[in-house]
């Protein structure tokens, strides 16, 4: 694709799923760069079931658990595990995931809640950040904050 990574997708605005600032961020940035370099599918892209841009984001999240990313249920491809694996830690690093080529799977994590993946579509519940997760609709529940300090800090620094 020749599109910019943060460009609109069918006129939808991209949104921030993690914003970390303050002391400790430089180390996280280095880990993100290393994770991006270790992505096993740099020259492959399949919209469904993956690998795609959401597979890449999930890979970086798994490699950098400090991000604690809870990828949106509409992120088709997030459940496509690297190199044919069927078990992995969840993208947030706070749970576990079982997935068969991103087509069928289960995930349970502190950040994500419990998710069922059928044909790349996510159905789930998040009891700790109350929401129901549905394909196309996304998260149904109170809005969550997208700002999470890397380490408690009195003054924000540059964004990641």
Outline where the language-model segments fall:
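Non-catalytic ligand/cofactor/substrate-binding and regulatory segments of enzyme domains
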Residues: 1-49, 62-64, 88-160
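Intrinsic-disorder/low-complexity, polar/charged segments
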Residues: 21, 53, 71-74
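Amphipathic, coiled-coil-like alpha-helical scaffolding segments used for oligomerization/assembly
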Residues: 47-57
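Solvent-exposed loop/turn segments at secondary-structure junctions
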Residues: 52-53, 76-78, 105
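Sparse, context-dependent recognition of short Cys/His-centered cofactor- or disulfide-binding micro-motifs
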Residues: 54, 83, 99-101
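Catalytic cysteine-centered active-site loop
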Residues: 66-85
């Amino acid at each position: 694709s020749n599109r910019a990574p943060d460009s609109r997708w069918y006129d939808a605005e991209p949104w921030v799923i993690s914003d970390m600032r303050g002391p400790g961020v430089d180390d996280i940035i280095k880990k993100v760069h290393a994770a991006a370099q270790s992505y096993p599918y740099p020259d492959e892209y399949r919209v469904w079931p993956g690998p795609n841009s959401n597979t890449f984001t999930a890979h970086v999240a798994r490699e950098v658990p400090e991000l604690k990313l809870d990828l949106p249920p509409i992120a088709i491809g997030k459940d496509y595990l690297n190199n044919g694996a069927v078990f992995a830690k969840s993208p947030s690093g706070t749970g576990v995931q079982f997935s068969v080529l991103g087509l069928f799977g289960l995930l349970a994590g502190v950040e994500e809640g419990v998710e069922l993946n059928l044909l790349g579509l996510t159905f789930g519940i998040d009891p700790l950040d109350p929401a129901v997760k549905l394909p196309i609709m996304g998260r149904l529940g109170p809005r969550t904050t997208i700002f999470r300090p890397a380490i408690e800090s009195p003054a924000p620094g540059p964004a990641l």
